[in-house]
From Swiss-Prot:
Enzyme class: ligase
Protein's pathway: Purine metabolism; 7-cyano-7-deazaguanine biosynthesis
UniProtKB keywords: ATP-binding, Glutamine amidotransferase, Ligase, Metal-binding, Nucleotide-binding, Zinc
Gene that encodes it: queC2
Reaction catalysed by this enzyme: 7-carboxy-7-deazaguanine + NH4(+) + ATP = 7-cyano-7-deazaguanine + ADP + phosphate + H2O + H(+)
Function of the molecule: Catalyzes the ATP-dependent conversion of 7-carboxy-7-deazaguanine (CDG) to 7-cyano-7-deazaguanine (preQ(0)).
Ranges where the Glutamine amidotransferase type-2 domain occurs: 2-225
Active site annotation, chain numbering: C2 (for gatase activity)
CDD domains: Gn_AT_II, QueC-like
InterPro entries in the cross-refs: GATase_2_dom (IPR017932), Ntn_hydrolases_N (IPR029055), QueC (IPR018317), Rossmann-like_a/b/a_fold (IPR014729)
Name the record gives this protein: 7-cyano-7-deazaguanine synthase 2
EC number(s) reported in the record: 6.3.4.20
Length: 460
């Protein structure tokens, strides 16, 4: 839709260099908007200077030079891609962002679907049909500059947004409010300025620059003393958790741990034509019954279609060299994108059926061999989550045993009373654990390290 840009100037004496960097950001931001661009600068005394034009800044760069001076404090800017629903044939300056109110200046990326309703509810008048133009008069009339009050106003907006807001009465600060629309922040210590824009690529930052992605569903206030205040737009507390459960040690301990912490959990199990499908299914059913929690099963042929893994029936032999140590140290039984697919399905179910979070048995031990067991996989998926769910339906991603190795998981499981005796860890689907695959090796060693007898039986 658009790219939003903002700058909070800490060292006004560097205004010429800051101006050059701003222009470069706006030129790169044409990636998200080529129909018009605008820049409004708030001076120390609250007065403003502005430039607005149709088309691209790269073809009209000369209009931007000289917009800053030694008294400039806050810059609010926009590169607009005009959506079909807001096409204006004969545009005037009033149709070009940023929009200016008596006190507040606003640049907006997104769509406000209920702009007409907001206009009536707050009894305000805007000067253009553009949806974003309804925001400054509402803020002028109802917002006192405190982010807690801004939250109440933003909760009335139906749609998507990333706002960057300047305050003429307090030109020593800048505000950023967003749901799932992205905003990045970069502090340029050398220039003495804090830059904000829609994608980090627009900064052209070096490896040593401080670049931060601001959290979705948050409001951030930054002042020129380098103080940051932040609140969350959503007050949702985590109560219901959907746990991806294989029937093995890790997910069983993870589920039990969450249950003991007071969460309402449901187990989610996938049957995907893997060698141990029947044994895992039997195990997870008994575990759900033991913990007295619901179980959701999903049967899928997807991995049979993908193939290229020995973990599936008919897929080849499981590696059992060195009594299983070889399988514990390398991902011989890798299943392409399995955890990503499991997590994506879990996320969809969580959103659809009102779960607050998803979790699994991903752990530090298996991260040594499997990329999708790495803690970073979970962290990155958690960051993806707000962009994969509907507006205001944020689903958290938890990893209860993500920082534990196998013997620590066994120790925790014993301490919290997890039904370890019901679990199935083996890659094979025999009557007993084979004792020679990677998971069997790790399981046996984990119990041995803890000085405990493993409650399951092995063939050897």
């Amino acid at each position: 839709m658009c790219s939003v840009t903002g700058v909070l100037i800490i060292k006004p004496e560097n205004y010429e260099k800051i101006e050059k960097k701003l222009i470069q950001i706006l030129k790169r931001a044409e990636d998200r908007g080529r129909d018009s661009f605008g820049v409004i600068v708030i001076e120390k005394d609250g007065s403003v200077r502005k430039v607005k034009a149709l088309g691209r800044p790269s073809t009209q760069e000369e209009k931007l030079y000289g917009i800053l001076d030694e008294n400039s404090k806050v810059i609010i800017a926009n590169n607009r891609a005009e959506p079909t629903t807001e096409y204006v044939r004969q545009k005037t300056e009033e149709d070009i962002q940023p929009f200016e109110g008596e006190r507040y200046i606003v640049t907006h990326n997104g769509i406000i679907a209920n702009d007409l309703e907001l206009e009536k509810k707050y009894n305000v008048i805007r000067r253009t049909k553009i949806d974003s133009a309804v925001v400054p008069p509402i803020l002028d009339k109802y917002w006192n500059g405190e982010i807690e009050q801004l939250k109440k106003i933003l909760n009335d907006i139906k749609g998507s947004f990333a706002f960057i807001i300047g305050d003429k009465k307090r030109p020593n600060r800048i505000y950023i409010a967003q749901n799932f629309k992205p905003v990045y922040m970069m502090y340029d210590r050398e220039l003495g300025a804090i830059f904000f824009t829609s994608l980090d690529d627009y900064f052209d930052a070096s490896a040593f620059d401080s670049v931060t992605k601001l959290d979705p569903y948050s409001i951030v206030e930054v002042n020129d003393n380098l103080e940051i205040r932040k609140i969350q737009l959503l007050d949702k507390k985590i109560k219901k958790v959907l746990v991806i459960a294989s029937g093995g040690l890790d997910s069983t301990v993870a589920a039990t741990y969450l249950l003991r912490q007071g969460y309402e959990i449901t187990l989610l199990h996938f049957n995907y034509h893997h060698k141990a499908e029947e044994r895992e299914r039997e195990a997870v059913k008994k575990i759900a019954e033991y913990l007295q929690v619901p179980l959701i099963e999903i049967d899928t042929d997807l991995f049979k279609i993908i193939g290229h893994t020995t973990l599936l029936k008919g897929g080849g032999e499981i590696v059992k060299d060195r009594l299983g140590e070889e399988g514990a140290e390398f991902a011989h039984e890798w299943v392409p994108a399995r955890n990503l697919i499991f997590y994506s399905v879990a996320l969809a179910l969580a959103e659809a059926y009102g779960y607050d979070a998803i979790a699994s048995g991903i752990n530090l031990e298996e991260a040594g061999a499997y990329p999708d067991n790495e803690m970073e996989f979970v962290r990155l998926f958690a960051k993806l989550s707000p962009y994969a769910t509907g507006p205001n339906k944020k689903v958290e991603v938890m990893m209860p045993v993500g920082n534990l190795v196998k013997h620590e998981i066994v120790k925790l499981g014993v301490e919290i009373g997890a039904p370890l005796h019901l679990t199935w860890s083996c890659y094979e689907g025999g009557q007993k654990h084979c004792g020679k695959c990677g998971p069997c090796y790790m399981r046996k060693m984990a119990f041995r390290i803890n000085g405990l007898n493993d409650p399951v039986e092995y063939e050897n």
